[in-house]
Design a protein with these regions (language model features):
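Positively charged
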Residues: 2-201
Length: 201
C-alpha cells in the first residue's frame, strides 16, 4: 500500500473527504514583509482594528493562497503557533482569528472546533467555503478587529469547507461543519475576502 493510499484512508477515517491533488508550482511563498512580521513577533501578534486607517486597508484586502512548499516551512509553523497564542491570549479570548487580522493577507484561519472532543483550536490553510446551506439563523457575533461591539448576524447553519491538509498540503480536503463552529468559519473566511461581519448587518 503506497503513501497516497494511506493518506486517503486516514482522511476518510477522520470524516474528511479528500478532494484533489494540488501541484506545487513554486508560487505562494511569503513576501519579505510577511516574513519580517512573523519573525519579529513576540509571544503574540498585534491585532489590526478598523479604528486605524492603515489597519483597515489591510483588513479590506483580499487574501491569497500559500504553496504546499510554504505550508511546510518554518515560517508557516511559527505563524500558526503565534496566531494560536494570540487568539487564546487573555487579552483577546477569541474563538477564531484570520491571518489578515495580524497583517498577513493569506488564506489562513485558526478556529476553535466546538464540534470536536476537547474543543481544540485548529489551523486551516488555503481555506474557502464551497457550499452553504439555505438554512439560516441569526446569532451574536463580535470581532477582535472591531472592538467593543456585538451584533446579530445571519449565517448558514451548515457549510462545506475546502482546505489544504497540514501534514500533506499538496492534498485539498473537504469537511462538513455545522452549528456554531460553522458560524465561526464563515466569520473568519469572510476576513480572507476583505469582508467584516459589520458589512453583513
Amino acid at each position: 500500500m503506497n503513501r497516497n493510499t494511506l493518506l486517503v484512508i486516514l482522511a476518510i477515517s477522520l470524516g474528511i473527504i479528500v478532494w484533489g491533488y494540488i501541484p506545487d508550482r513554486g508560487e505562494g511563498g511569503f513576501t519579505s514583509h510577511e516574513k519580517e512580521l512573523i519573525r519579529d513577533a513576540d509571544s503574540i501578534f498585534r491585532v489590526l482594528t478598523v479604528e486605524d486607517s492603515l489597519d483597515n486597508a489591510v483588513l479590506r484586502a483580499p487574501s491569497t493562497d500559500l504553496s504546499p512548499k510554504t505550508i511546510k516551512s518554518r515560517d508557516f509553523i511559527d505563524l500558526c503557533n503565534t496566531m494560536l497564542r494570540t487568539v487564546t491570549h487573555p487579552s483577546q479570548d477569541g474563538v477564531g482569528i484570520a491571518a489578515p487580522q495580524i497583517g498577513i493577507n493569506r488564506r489562513i484561519v485558526a478556529v476553535q472546533r466546538f464540534d470536536k472532543p476537547g474543543e481544540p483550536f485548529e489551523v486551516y490553510p488555503n481555506v474557502r467555503i464551497v457550499w452553504a446551506s439555505d438554512s439560516l439563523a441569526y446569532g451574536p457575533e463580535g470581532c477582535l478587529s472591531v472592538p467593543d461591539r456585538r451584533e446579530e448576524v445571519l449565517r448558514s447553519q451548515e457549510i462545506v469547507i475546502e482546505y489544504a491538509l497540514l501534514q500533506h498540503p499538496q492534498w485539498a480536503v473537504r469537511d462538513t461543519v455545522k452549528g456554531f463552529t460553522a458560524v465561526i468559519f464563515q466569520h473568519e473566511i469572510d476576513h480572507l475576502d476583505g469582508v467584516l461581519y459589520i458589512d453583513r448587518l
